[in-house]
Amino acid sequence: MPSLPLSGVPAEHAPGLPPVARRFCRYVRVDTTSDPASDATPSTDRQLDLCRMLVEELREIGLADAEMDATGVVYATVPGTAPDAPVVALAAHVDTSPDAPGAGVRPLVHPAWDGRPFALPGDPAVVFDPATDADLADAVGHDLITSDGTTLLGSDDKAGVAVIVQLAADLLRADAEAQVAGHPPLPRPTLRLLFTPDEEIGRGADPVDLARLGADVAYTLDGSGVDRLNAETFNAAEAVVTVEGVGVHPGYAKDVMVNALRVAAAVVAALPADEAPETTEGPDGYVHPHTLTGEAERATLRVLLRDFTDAGLERRRALVRQAAADAQAAFPGSVVTVEITESYRNMRAHIDAVDPRAVTVALDAARAMGFEMALEPVRGGTDGARLSERGLPTPNVFTGGHRFHSRAEWNTVQNLERALAYTHALVHAWADHGDRRSPPRRP
């Protein structure tokens, strides 16, 4: 098979990039990989490098109250011009997934991509082909942004970070121009900006001080594709299966050794293959054994559990417990224990109970731009799931990216601009539709 052409211009040499794309390419170069094995907050110090950069840039554009707290969470305020409007928070996470390399990201631009397959220069095995990635068909003619193939790109969620900071800069510049021209600024609510570490490992929203944030409604900018709103997530839990075997010299192990790795493998084998991530889609949940560590004497298996319904998640908990019990019975002398912890809940019920305007105003903003927003459940989680559970309704807005958590991750200049334009419309829609004097329902 002939090799594919290599493609990509280093972003720093790509002419004519708009400010939001330049900002995005600058942010993705900062290594912010989080670490699920760390008990620190944040889990990695490298995330603080981008947090400090954000504080500095936010202050430079005029947000004097920009500040990072002791947990790495960054807060800032864009003053509003419609005093009766609700306070709206815009949130994004700074960390990138540990599922793919995140250090040394080199963003490449592929100008006016013609739709023909290509490979990345850092690793020609990373291929972009509409035949294997259907979403690429919508990007023909766009200026693609990728990594060089040796790392992920970091669009999840530095695209959201870039859009929010660029939005703030745009609004403040428009205010200054209106003042010079002697015109009143366009009405908008007060905006609270929020940037969190450790979202990728399920801890992003926990350190957020909701009283300090002071928002009535919020949006995470952490969604894939374009023109999509997520107001429903999985219910999520993680099962930690610990296997105690019996260790002995392998030369004298007959009828004595109980190999913990084989026991753990039996647990994995007992999980239904038709309920795995690679065999499910749409409304289906899944059971995902994602990490196995250990040796013959002791092993630890981590299993992600996901379902859109409470009953479905409980059934998956039972599947893991039964698989563990069966494995222990099949390997006499082994001890298999299961500990299951909840990660986040489906946010739709919390949004509807507290303030359903979080969804309706977002849909109205799209209509004002001339399109219908696709309201889709997200097959994953966001900081918004936990924030919604804590009482702050927080749907998730698109940022243009695709193939998250992989070295084939991509976005486009046009998608970033679309996300920025929509976020402008969303902010101003709250001045038209929201009224803080009419308090939302509380659970």
Mark where each language-model region is.
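Metal-dependent amide/peptide-bond hydrolase catalytic core
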Residues: P2-G8, A260-P443
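Fold-independent oxyanion-binding glycine-rich loops
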Residues: V30, T71, A92-V94, D148-T150, ...
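Short, conserved micro-motifs enriched in small and acidic residues
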Residues: D45, T150-A162, K254-R262, W410-E417
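N-terminal capping segment at the start of a domain
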Residues: P2-S7, A11, L17-D45, L144-T146, ...
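Structural motif
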Residues: P86-A89, D143-L144, L191-R192, D216-Y219, ...
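Midchain, well-structured core segments that form catalytic/ion-binding scaffolds
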Residues: L136, H142-S155, R173, H183-P185, ...
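A non-catalytic alpha/beta surface segment that caps or lines the substrate-entry region
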Residues: D39-A85, A89-A91, D95
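Active-site metal-coordination/substrate-binding segment of hydrolases
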Residues: D84-T190, A215
